[in-house]
Amino acid sequence: MIDRYTHQQLRIGLVSPQQISTWSKKILPNGEIVGEVTKPYTFHYKTNKPEKDGLFCERIFGPIKSGICACGNYRVIGDEKEDPQFCEQCGVEFVDSRIRRYQMGYIKLAYPVMHVWYLKRLPSYIVTLLDKPLNELEDLVYCNFYFARPIDKKPTFLRLRGLLEYEIQPWKYRIPIFFTTRSFDTFRNREMSTGGGSIRQQLANLDLRIIIDYSLVEWKELEEEEPTGNEWEDRKVGRRKDFLLRRMELAKHFIRTNIEPKWMVLRLLPVLPPELRPIYHIDEDKLVTSDINEIYRRIIYRNNTLTDLLTTSIATPEELIISQEKLLQEAVDALLDNGICGQPMRDDHNRVYKSLSDVIEGKEGRVRETLLGKRVDYSGRSVIVVGPSLSLHRCGLPREIAIELFQAFVIRDLIRKHLASNIGVAKSQIRKKKPIVWEILQEILDDHPVLLNRAPTLHRLGIQAFLPVLVEGRAICLHPLVCKGFNADFDGDQMAVHVPLSLEAQAEARLLMFSHMNLLSPTIGDPISAPTQDMLSGLYVLTSGNRRGICVNRYNPCNRRNYQNEDNNYKYTKKKEPFFCNPYDAIGAYRQKRINLGSPLWLRWRLDQRVIAAREVPIEIHYESVGTYYEIYGHYLIVRSIKKEILYIYIRTTLGHISLYREIEEAIQGFWQGCCNSMLPTGIRVSPG
């Protein structure tokens, strides 16, 4: 059983048959060893008690009721004076019934069975280690081919090499007909092999260090070769180099973790604890059971049949043995990952059985729903909405959520500042929502980060830290630039908020997890904070004004008709385009509804006049009575004096472009000010302007 205080991490990997046996075996006082499930039965139809050596056996998995054996005898749990700890009649241990949640059993397979996860999943570990095509290994596993060679390194009778197709069997007629079943099994293991046993023997003969050396030599040879110019051949060489790198990494992993490759072929099949695959009695004659129980039953039936064929029968045809081995392999495949090798296993109502992979993986699987999706203290959840006015490292936290998450902090400060005499009075003030409560809460939020997480957390940017800001409503406000890291959008997505309590967690949030410190992708280094969706739409609206030039606007009759159809509130659309001395006047005119975002206007240009090179010929020249004149170009206008000196320069733009320019300018100034302050000594700061 996993103790949360002593076990801080969980690792899923390969285990040896000895370890599986250790998990399951128990030695009774009479010396009998229990743990192996040999019968495909669950409960007796008359007594409703678990069958002995069945899938719910109390001797193997523990008592159904704490301290009560199958005979009905009772012992005090944990009392060392009580003797014996096992019932002498039924062999059930007097322990807590919760042992049935973690006590495992095992099935001793009559023939080695391939673990389908390591064969069919990508990348296939067995294909990588053996360096053979996947279809060839599948034909061996499912007994479509024989692997003919001296596996045991002894003289052979047939002198065959390579793969032999099952249907042809050219060796069949050379075998004397007086071979019995047991003799045939010995002969086959000596001369040739098929099924999971052939894969297991090849994996057992591997030397991982030799694999690393040979793969490294081949990779260096391919690296030294020059490109052939043939795209197909060059890609083939590149794929081979990638395969060799994966093979070396996998071999190093097996060496580093002390895992033997032959463990990927099962000799002992673990049986889950019964509480994890329950069976319920609805009525007297109706049962509801887990699909895993039905698959276990088929495995035991087929395994017992194969055992009988190999041990008891004398003249069983070898085709029948091969067929039964294939059925056993398919049953174990259905338990691990139903449907991965073709047609899934179904029940009598044509419903697909739910395998272990279906229980573990997916959004509703054991990991994501039960473990990662488990509710914890000091956490909340709500829908996210866009917060365009927020800083990149801030998020909007609803008052209702904030006061619940930080209630303990608010109570502490109320008592510390002598605003409440005890916890009860402080909670009363919080329930009444007094103004002092919100002031204290805002002080706490100014210096306490929170963690935002969006499931599924597939990479480290799926959970980031923010400084919260109190907002109205019930939705969490999020800056749109951080959505890409969360893979979130604002169409109803929900996010969870967590409060880091310890100083270590708060320090980690500030130093490593703040959103403005995770601007680049940790995998490829590309910017992860890029404008998407709403921001791109907003930028398009700001810059989609009529910028085609003065000629098109002035002399196109269709454009004049469009002007006449616009809103009457914008008086400049029917007359000439307005002139503004600075951006503030243009913004004021927009707020007074005198212009809109896309209305063309003339804005006085106050920057270096040398940036405008008068290389083009003016479209029009307007002369004033005082002697000044206007040179009108496509996108700008120059006002000159009588002496042809430049008095003013106006650029033709829109209010949307002005707003975008101001935002960019403020961002650059803020960045420059932050860089200067970071380089100056402590206590000296650069003020804006």
From Swiss-Prot:
Assigned GO CC terms: chloroplast; DNA-directed RNA polymerase complex; mitochondrion
Keywords: Chloroplast, DNA-directed RNA polymerase, Magnesium, Metal-binding, Nucleotidyltransferase, Plastid, Transcription, Transferase, Zinc
Cofactor note: Binds 1 Mg(2+) ion per subunit. Binds 1 Zn(2+) ion per subunit.
UniProt binding sites for Mg(2+): D489, D491, D493
Protein residues bound to Zn(2+): C69, C71, C87, C90
Gene3D superfamilies membership: 1.10.40.90, 2.40.40.20, RNA polymerase II, clamp domain (4.10.860.120), RNA polymerase Rpb1, domain 3 (1.10.274.100)
One Pfam family recorded for the sequence: RNA_pol_Rpb1_1
Job of this protein: DNA-dependent RNA polymerase catalyzes the transcription of DNA into RNA using the four ribonucleoside triphosphates as substrates.
The protein, known as: DNA-directed RNA polymerase subunit beta'
Gene name for this UniProt entry: rpoC1
